[in-house]
Amino acid sequence: GVTNKRPELDGEIRTTIDQTAWTDEVFSMKRGKMELVASGTHSLLSADGTPLWLVQKGKFAYRILPEYTREAFVTCETRPTDWVKRNKVNEKKQGLPSEARILRLWANHGQRPVDDTYGYVVYAGRQIPSDELPFRVLQNDTLVQAVCSMDGKVVEAVLYPGNKGLQAEGLSLSASAPCAVLIREEAGEIVVSVTDACMNAALKGIRIVLNGREIKVPMPQRMF
């Protein structure tokens, strides 16, 4: 739901995926092949529109979901620092670095987005991530965000205020209040975990309806 309410102003609307220290080599990956990313700005989509994994050596890997993200970029850059601008206390400090190496990733929505979307994946493992994701996105908008593992044994969903529930292939889910829901199959049983997304201290419980079955989940009371 990204919308620019002042489109007459210069500049583009961006969503930051990550902004961190550029401390080591940065690689893009496609079909298991790694390619060193040079300084400058580069697209996170290959020439044929296929999304690339982007990883800094020893760090997290990122990949956009092209069905939700039209444009995304990475920049490896070195910029001058201004420590006094950050904090006046730094006026008396000596030996602060004069420049910083920065790695930035962002989704670009352009100058006049209206209800634009974005989506990306973060991989925290040590192996080379696969081009085939281990999950599928069921819904990704301002009312419901939900994913399901490829084997169907794990479903994660966030139901925002005003949502009408989730309807997907083989799955129907609704809740009596905004919440985050984790559904997983364990030893032939279905385990449901629910978190009150609004942290409403007066909320006694949340009623979940999963594929027509009602599940009442009490919320913790007097914890704070």
Task: Label every model-predicted segment.
Residues G1, D10-R14, G49-T50, K59, ...:
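Extracellular structured ligand-interaction cores
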Residues N4-P7, T20-W22, K59-A61, T69, ...:
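Short, glycine-/Ser/Thr-/acidic-enriched flexible segments
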Residues T3-E35, R207:
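Acidic (Asp/Glu-rich), glycine- and aromatic
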Residues Y123-F224:
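Non-catalytic terminal regions with compositionally biased, polar/charged low complexity
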Residues K5-L9, P97-E99, Q111-D115, E185-A187, ...:
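A structural signal for short secondary-structure junctions
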Residues E67-V154, Y160-P161:
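Beta-strand-rich recognition/accessory modules
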Residues A61, D116-V121, Q221-F224:
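C-terminal beta-strand-rich structural cap/linker in extracellular carbohydrate-active enzymes
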Residues K33-W106, G165-L173, M199-L203, K216:
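Trp/Gly-enriched beta-strand surface patches
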